[in-house]
Amino acid sequence: MKRLYPYIPIVVLTPFSHEVSRRIAKEDLSGVDYVFSWLGNVDLLVAIIKLIEDKMNAEVDITSVGVQLILLVEDSIRFYSSILPNLYNFVLKQSQIFSTEALNDHERMLRMRGRPKVMLARTYEEAMQIYEKYSGNMLGIVSDVSFVRAGEKDKKAGIKFCTYVRSCDPYLPLIIESSERENQKEAIKLNASFLDKNSKKLPVDLRKTILKNFGFGDFTFINPNTGEPIVTIKNLKDLQDNIDIIPDDSLYYHASRITYPDGSIRVLFFLWPKPCSLDKLPI
């Protein structure tokens, strides 16, 4: 099928067990784009469609338009089959909240289409390729620790990848997830959040961590010297009412450290009367 229709995505859905996992490991999957563990969750079908759409539209939407990207690095079929529906549900819900400020249906649709993309990497090389290509629009990274690197399973591949990312970008939000608690020490060294894959409330923990670190939800400007909050921006009206009281040093602090999924905050950084020291910020 793949030889006849190379541009049509092919996805395999299978109930998962240890026997199925062993068989898949031995099969030639070169003709398959993705394999997912099917447990009857219909949200997985939506996530698969969105994942394929994001991959196909990434070149134009990210490079040309400036849409941002969340990168998931994970090779466990069972795990990414569980996480992706939760991740997409969260991103779509946040986009719906943002779109409620739209003036009409057309603008609302455009805001929904401008949601952050989600891309899946299953090897070290695939993760590096995506990061190198879209690093300027990366909103955050969620990475496993153990996955394939240079053709073999590397128990520290995720740490090596995140170490490289951190050397390129000191402030990009990183979430390291692992079933081995000792990897939490490595996450702390990289100034990354750590999630235990064995936790029964992992999906909840992931949503909370992304909400806190990836710039979703209400945005609070803080005093960079004291850490005290200055003002919280919930929507464009709040931004308009409080724009005059935000100090330049607070703006510089936030603009130089993170990217934001909320377009109103990014527009603020672009329109602000910038001193010379702000000219090189990646707005």
Model-derived regions: residue spans:
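CheY-like receiver
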Residues: 40-43, 47, 56-86, 207, ...
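Long C-terminal appendages of very large multidomain proteins
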Residues: 243, 247-283
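Alpha4 helix (beta4-alpha4-beta5 surface) of REC/receiver domains from two-component response regulators
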Residues: 3-4, 12-37, 42-46, 57-59, ...
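Local beta-strand N-terminus motif with an aromatic residue
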Residues: 32, 136-139, 143, 191
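Acidic, metal-coordinating helix/loop segments flanking the phosphotransfer/catalytic sites
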Residues: 98-140
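Conserved acidic segment of CheY-like receiver
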Residues: 67-78, 83-107, 118-120
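Active-site residues of response regulator receiver
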Residues: 142-151
